[in-house]
Amino acid sequence: MDTIRSYIAKARAFFAAHRAARIAGYILAAWLVFVLVFHPKGTKTFLLLGMDNYGSLNTVGRSDVMMLVQVDFTRADISTVTFARDMFIPDENGRKQKINTIVRQSGEEALVTAMENAFQVDIDGWFRVNFTTVIELVDAIGGVRIDLTEKEARYINRNTGDYEPLVEGKNHLNGDQALVFARCRQLDNDMGRGERQNKVMAAMVAQTKRMTIANVVSVFSSLKHAWVSSLSGFEQVRLLGNALWLRGAHVNSIGMPLGNWKYANSGVEIKMEENVQLLHEALGLPAPVFPDKK
């Protein structure tokens, strides 16, 4: 006990005699409090809806992107799941509907309810963005680096403005180019487009490691009109603060359907139980529970 008291007394004497050491100690203590109190923990899941229109977010177009975003703040890990927009799931009345039809006819909350019931996931909120959002945010963070095939590079060059031509391999895309890349399905199908959307999201997260102070200021300026959300203003501010801990986080990209499916009735019909099981495994969720068919 005397030894401990002696060490404490010596430490007090040292800090009393050295002003710089006292300041450094205060800063270290404040940083530790910040880490322990404000470092986000746990997992949140959000539904991201991308509309096929420019300008005001009050104008609701057709849903061009259906993406579930699971954020693990404890491990700094993000999983994105893109859903084929013409996939059939039961709506809130039990009728099979395409997911983009549900949101267009009944709104975001109805789609959240339908997806929670169909896939047995808890969704903490939704965000609606549009083409303008993607362009402005990608430009604000300084563009994104994406590996392109020769066909993808040619497609983007044909469908964007007078920019330096892109080539096969690693390219730096601006907002216009990233949007065209994310929307492209002419080269393959809706599943391919979903994979490209996941690549853009992963590239945006990776780019946060390289952002300058000017980029950060530009991002916060863009966020004033970036989306419409079910979250309150306070919840959005807190989420943005939490997102600072995710700079350069690992992104795991998934495309639904994961299991058996077929194209029928002008849409994607899936084997629900198999796909739900695979989705839960991919996201590290508890095993789903299905009704007894006996």
Feature roles, as predicted:
Residues 2-294:
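Non-catalytic, solvent-exposed segments at the cell envelope interface
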